[in-house]
Regions:
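Mature extracytoplasmic/periplasmic domains
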Residues: 114-145
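C-terminal helix/juxtamembrane-tail motif
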Residues: 144-176
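Short, flexible active-site recognition loops that position polar ligands and cofactors
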Residues: 89-90, 94, 146, 150
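Intrinsically disordered, low-complexity, compositionally biased regions/tails
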Residues: 14, 115, 120-123, 154, ...
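Substrate-gating cap/lid region and adjacent catalytic-acid/histidine neighborhood
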Residues: 1-92, 103, 110, 174
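Non-catalytic, well-ordered alpha-helical segments in soluble enzyme domains
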Residues: 93-118
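Generic detector of well-ordered alpha-helical segments enriched in charged/polar residues
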Residues: 10, 66, 133, 153-157, ...
């Protein structure tokens, strides 16, 4: 398994707990678009930290906090309950940390994260709107993309409900 492979169980969990709710949330915040311009930005932190060891492959929940705060090793272990090896934190991780900290602090100060991104990369991150559905895929080289996990979001929102209607579960069935 290379570091870009993620298990189907992790994908399922990420969809149900993070991806689908995040997309639904930003859609709700931008429902008045274009009448009211969007000030909502969607970010997908796609990075595979070298300090994560064991079975965790990819950006685990709350691991982005290591890029946002100056936390020591003991604090990190309290914040991120995953096996880590702080000795694997290298220059790439430090550079990414400063990009992330700068971008988030710029967003907090101004409401627009682009000053934090444009000075450190070549992307222009537009606010989310229901038509373009833009988001920032944040990694060593940030990239603006559209329709976060679109196929999987459509699976959960359209295909699975359709299947449930087509193939209802018979509660009286002895096979259950």
């Amino acid at each position: 398994m290379n570091h870009f492979d993620v298990s189907p169980v992790n994908d399922l969990t990420a969809d149900l707990l993070f991806n689908l709710p995040a997309v639904q949330y930003v859609e709700g915040l931008t429902q008045d678009f274009p009448r009211r311009p969007s000030k909502t930005y969607l970010l997908y932190f796609k990075h595979f930290p070298k300090f994560m060891v064991g079975d965790i492959q990819g950006m685990a929940h709350a691991a982005d906090l290591l890029y946002l705060f100056d936390a020591g090793d003991l604090d990190v272990r309290k914040l991120v309950p995953f096996p880590i090896d702080p000795n694997n934190w290298g220059p790439e991780e430090t550079a990414l940390k400063y990009k992330y900290m700068h971008m988030i602090s710029e967003f907090v100060k101004t409401g627009n994260p682009n000053k934090g991104v444009s000075g450190l990369s070549t992307c222009d991150w537009p606010p989310f709107d229901p038509q373009r559905r833009s988001y920032l895929q944040f990694a060593e080289y940030p990239e603006v993309k559209n329709d976060l996990k679109g196929d999987r979001v459509r699976l959960w929102r359209q295909q699975i409900p359709m299947w449930i209607k087509q193939y209802p579960i018979d509660e009286a069935s002895p096979n259950m």
